[in-house]
């Protein structure tokens, strides 16, 4: 059995930029969640890219930047512009270009929009795009995407402190496992402000314990009790 390489080959199409990946993910998501307004206008597409919820990382991009990314996706045939409206509207062609079923497209979409996730998280997050019966069915489609030549997703080794492995898409190019794991650890790390608060709380508790110990020793001396005796017996 071959050992796991440090990086995985990207799809045959060129690697997407982070914003191209976000634009593609938004187009697929909104096709399912707001079908009445799909294909999307540039304004709606930009709003979807800058959405504060269900996005990782959160972006703040302009319509001009989104339009540049659309042009890049057009050259890859991953997106196209509709011709039935006076206002330019855009749609995706990912299923056709990559040759994947809707179930796999739903999983890729969530990975594009939310970053690395476990199979359980993906099942929950894809509910509005496709309802997977159980986690094993999610894993089956992920395994299929990972087994493609070239692979479209990769299963990351479990990072310290994690109970399950996360999956990551490969549409933005090769993934260095060390970098991906470091990113996962950073996400789970305690923020510096919270760490400082914990240190201050520990210091206060230590001082309070010292005051209580001094009070107990004082009362023991007043009552003629050997305080150390209780410590030894306990």
UniProtKB/Swiss-Prot annotation:
Highest taxon listed in the record's lineage: Bacteria
Disulphide bridges: none
InterPro entries per record: DUF480, WH-like_DNA-bd_sf, WH_DNA-bd_sf
Family matches, as Pfam families: DUF480
UniProt similarity note: Belongs to the UPF0502 family.
Protein name: UPF0502 protein BTH_II0990
